[in-house]
Amino acid sequence: MDFFSTSSLSSYYHLIFTILAFVISSIIYFLSKKAESKKLKLPPGPPGWPVVGNLLQVARSGKPFFQIMRELRQKYGPIFTLRMGTRTMIILSNADLVHEALILKGQVFATRPRENPTRTVFSCDKFTVNAAVYGPVWRSLRKNMVQNGLSSIRLKEFRAVRKSAMDKMIEKIRAEADANEGVVWVLKNARFAVFCILLAMCFGVEMDEKTIEKIDQMMKSVLIALDPRLDDYLPILSPFFSKQRKHAMDVRKQQIKTIVPFIEQRKKILESPEIDKTAASFSYLDTLFDLKIEGRNSTPTYPELVTLCSEFLNGGTDTTATAIEWAIGRLIENPNIQSQLYEEIKKTVGENKIDEKDIEKMPYLNAVVKELLRKHPPTYMSLTHAVTEPAKLGGYDIPTGVNVEIFLPGISDDPNLWSEPEKFDPDRFYLGKEDADITGVSGVKMIPFGMGRRICPGLNMATVHVSLMLARLVQEFEWADPENTRVDFTEKLEFTVVMKNTLRAKIKPRM
């Protein structure tokens, strides 16, 4: 191809203008940020390059981000600053600082920072419980989810759905074990069960396995499309990521195309219940059709309904499923804990199948789950916070527009808060040697679900799902390593913190 053809010249000039724009914008941005930072007392942190900040240092280190956080915490203390391109992150990794920010100064630290353009599209301009800025939209959405969608009364209405999903999970595990000399994949089976429950709760109908798989694959595509990209931190580079943006928009279109038929189906069922007598009398979606949003005259649009339903499904699936995988891994590693849990189950229900009403009578199960959430919180970082107005924390300035991140292992692994924090030990809770309020209100020692005004609204549902699923799995099967293997507890960050090598376990039926 002739380099000096019209199309080549066009591409050439586009590249030149992009580079010039980058250089000029970088100089302006750097000078403005430098002037601004001189006026503020930000927490300490590693020195960075102009414009890119610490972005290249993090990328070139070759280390997992959580390992970098641990090293920076050791060097700079419990509160430090990291500059990632145009984003400034202030990381908290100390219980007292987190309590001050999210409880004592909770209203100031209750909002969310700006999103990248891709996330803004998928969230319908922050129209979700988790992403909404602190204000009327967030209040309306959260109040509806807590009071109408996930209240204790509503959760009880889906007991039959949870029982059915547990039974199907056990059947699938038995069939897989029969075909593979007793060896099964833990995460895959747990994820399927949780997703079945959440689909039924969201849309009010039970679906066949093929439909469930179709929706699940679509939801995974959404999570992949939302993975951070370089242009999220350096927007000036966005012209070089047009292909990725187009792919993300295609995923969004597919998301809407997949979910809207279920929204329309549910609307028809509410208008004419006789068309599907197997449908549930209530679903989370029902609460959204006529939802009044403070400050708005209109009810949610179809794209907004798709976004809210997707939040409901994605928010509770991987977090619960990965918790189960970690739990089974810990029970394999500690057969004495597994045996004690099984004995409590037998003592509580005898030969009957364990039901969720039995969970409250099982203190050792509750201790195992609590220790699981301490040792293996769903993520390394809580959902990002931001301040509604300039604030002070730990003697430092917290300006608006920065990302306030909470590094959870800095708290749950703190030897000043826990005895032998590296050890998986349910007895710390069961024997009353230690305790922790997982909501963080009375003090911060572990915050697997966030805390304060932005605490996860699905906290109660998640603990029920994890407790019930773990109890059923231990009641039905004895869990062990496959021959010549050991559980690998190496971590990897995906949407949640997962096992780097997905857990395969050998089961022996008990019942």
Curated annotation (Swiss-Prot):
An MF annotation (GO) of this entry: heme binding
Q: Known CDD domains for this protein? A: CYP77_89
SUPFAM superfamilies from the xrefs?
Cytochrome P450
Q: Which Pfam families does the entry mention?
A: p450
Q: Which domain of life is it from?
A: Eukaryota
Q: Which InterPro entries match?
A: Cyt_P450 (IPR001128), Cyt_P450_CS (IPR017972), Cyt_P450_E_grp-I (IPR002401), Cyt_P450_sf (IPR036396)
UniProt keywords (A-Z) are: Heme, Iron, Metal-binding, Monooxygenase, Oxidoreductase
Its EC number(s):
1.14.-.-
Judged by the first EC level, this protein's enzyme class is oxidoreductase
Name the protein family.
Belongs to the cytochrome P450 family.
This one is known as Cytochrome P450 77A2
* Source organism (scientific name): Solanum melongena
Q: Highest lineage ranks of the organism?
A: Eukaryota, Viridiplantae, Streptophyta, Embryophyta, Tracheophyta
Q: Which gene encodes it?
A: CYP77A2
